[in-house]
């Protein structure tokens, strides 16, 4: 498995690779959100049903506008999300019609976050787009907290490990439905 810095990962992701990378709290698995084959590979590696949907993580909201249907959100709803970003808040927002079912699962929405983690931000900036994000673990197991855990669990299953440090957060992000304002999961 390749071990690379965020700036070196672009070609792997854009060519359909699945990567593991450090985030605010745990290691994540990610891929190109516009490549269904890569998303299916990620889901198979994680043993996660496609129906559950995935998260998109970005360095800025402008990277999410191709996926999120802003017309279904009020200015106040968007402002609330913007007031929490970048940071440990994931918002469930309505999707545009072309968004892959592998991303949104059985839902008419997708979970999105603008990350404050420098490594995640560098990845998204290098890609020029968001990254699919899900915790680096098999469904139902604890997520990986170290590069060694990634190497042990995913050797031969993913294409690269992004070098870097986890953030200081030890709780998952808070998830909020952007339309209703309802907290779906309390995090940090």
Curated annotation (Swiss-Prot):
Cellular localisation: Cytoplasm
GO BP, one annotated term: tRNA threonylcarbamoyladenosine modification
Pfam families for this protein: Sua5_yciO_yrdC
Domain YrdC-like: 3-188
PROSITE patterns in alphabetical order: YRDC
E.C. number(s) listed in UniProt: 2.7.7.87
Main subcellular location: cytoplasm
Keyword line: ATP-binding, Cytoplasm, Nucleotide-binding, Nucleotidyltransferase, Transferase, tRNA processing
Gene3D superfamilies xrefs: DHBP synthase
Catalytic activity: L-threonine + hydrogencarbonate + ATP = L-threonylcarbamoyladenylate + diphosphate + H2O
Keyword Cytoplasm attributed: yes
Family from the record: Belongs to the SUA5 family. TsaC subfamily.
Role according to the record: Required for the formation of a threonylcarbamoyl group on adenosine at position 37 (t(6)A37) in tRNAs that read codons beginning with adenine. Catalyzes the conversion of L-threonine, HCO(3)(-)/CO(2) and ATP to give threonylcarbamoyl-AMP (TC-AMP) as the acyladenylate intermediate, with the release of diphosphate.
Protein name as annotated: Threonylcarbamoyl-AMP synthase
Lineage, top ranks: Bacteria, Pseudomonadati, Pseudomonadota, Gammaproteobacteria, Alteromonadales
């Amino acid at each position: 498995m390749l071990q690379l810095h965020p700036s070196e990962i672009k070609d792997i992701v854009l060519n359909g690779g699945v990567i593991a990378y450090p985030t605010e709290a745990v290691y994540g698995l990610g891929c190109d959100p516009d490549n269904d084959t890569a998303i299916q590979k990620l889901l198979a590696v994680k043993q996660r049903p496609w129906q559950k949907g995935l998260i998109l993580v970005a360095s800025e909201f402008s990277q999410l506008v191709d996926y999120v249907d802003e017309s279904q959100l009020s200015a106040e709803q968007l402002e609330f999300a913007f007031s929490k970003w970048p940071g440990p808040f994931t918002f469930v927002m309505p999707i545009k019609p072309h968004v892959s079912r592998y991303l949104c699962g059985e839902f008419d929405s997708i979970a999105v976050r603008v990350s404050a983690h420098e490594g995640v931000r560098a990845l998204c900036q290098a890609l020029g787009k968001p990254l699919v994000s899900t915790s680096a673990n098999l469904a139902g197991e604890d997520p990986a907290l170290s590069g060694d855990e990634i190497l042990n669990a995913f050797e031969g299953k993913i294409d690269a490990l992004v070098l870097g440090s986890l953030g200081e957060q030890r709780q998952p992000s808070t998830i909020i439905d952007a339309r209703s304002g309802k907290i779906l999961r309390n995090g940090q």
